[in-house]
Amino acid sequence: MYDLVIVGAGPYGLSVAAHAAAHGLNLRIFGRTMESWHAMPSAMYLKSEPWASHLSDPEGAYGLDAYAATRGVRAEHGVPLPVGFFAAYGDWFARQAVPALDERLVTSVAPDGDGGYAVTAEDGETVRARTVALAVGVLPFMEVPGPLRGLPRRHVTHSSHHGELDGFAGRDVTVIGAGQAALETAAILTEQGAEVRILARADRLNWNTVPPALDRGAWRSLRAPHTGLGCGWQNKLYADTPGIFRRLPAATRERIFDSALGPAGAWWLRERFAAVRDVRLGQRVSGATVTADDRLRLDVTGRDGSSGVVETDHVIAATGFVPSLDRADVLAPGLRRELRRVGAGGAPEVGALFESSRPGLFLAGLLTAPSYGPSMRFVFGAGYTAGRLVKGVRQRLRAGSGRGGGVIGRPRTGEERVTAPAS
């Protein structure tokens, strides 16, 4: 039996694994390293600053800057990095700091009837663990507007479904949303020869400003301090005090989660986006049907009640993610129903050390944002999460059977990667 099984091998899962390995826990981590990051279009860039994009290890030895140095690249403030570079950084981090990683996906996490958990991989093998850390990223929580749900994938996709976008050249594509994913997707589609329109409920597009220099004098730094979430005192509170955020009333946390750090494009994207000529704001999709010639007819409604019709070849919904337990299908249905939730929302309530209301089940990443605040929507939150979560695991192990974990050997090398058996 493992002390800890980690489900997910993105920034949060890898960071938790690095801390758990350093503490000698007998652990196993399942997932394909940085899979969703590797699947992004190569023309996309990291929105966050390099110094706010580190994965977490106990010694701080394997930050993004350390990886950049091995590549002869300077990770500089105010200079965006390609998402492919960040994905490769995650791979490197795993080789340096994480013990043997099992690349199979997990299909089920369920109580084992003996106080622990049964974790089942995609090939049917089941392993047992005293504790589990669920770090499944954002993909299970994709949000698509109601009228578009259930339509064929040839007509409607989420922005996260796409790697390269060159297959849309010459086609009419409607992108729904007003955040970074929508604006960058629209810009890339335009660059690659698609006819693109943006359709958004927002009345205006918001753009982040060019970040001020890190060294700008005491007074300017005091007025608007830098944080991993952007400049300003409100962002500093979100970035530095997730533990205090967790103590707020549930309704307050839900409201802040829904409103803080709203949709906005990166400052460096604005010039690229200027090529997108058809931008329709203050409108929402109220209906959608497939036409006789296999296109999509969208009924749109304005804020003033006006209505209109858009015909398009394809819709890409860049409409974010909703951290609802009902979408965490990897958890057994009975286990999902057992977990306490934040207020009236569907997100799980998370304790002081990232433990859910079910002893031994720990959560990381987006699922914890309604408990710990906006930091958990970003890679930046992994630094706060990983060490505390592993502390919680160690406390739970001591409170349980009292059986200690085995000693993890040296961090794995690329040759130690565990893969699924051939079928």
Residue positions per predicted region:
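Flavin (primarily FAD) cofactor-binding/catalytic cores of flavoenzymes
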Residues: M1-T33, G78-Q180, E184-S423
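Flavin (FAD/FMN) cofactor-binding and adjacent substrate-gating region
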Residues: A39-G72, H226-R246
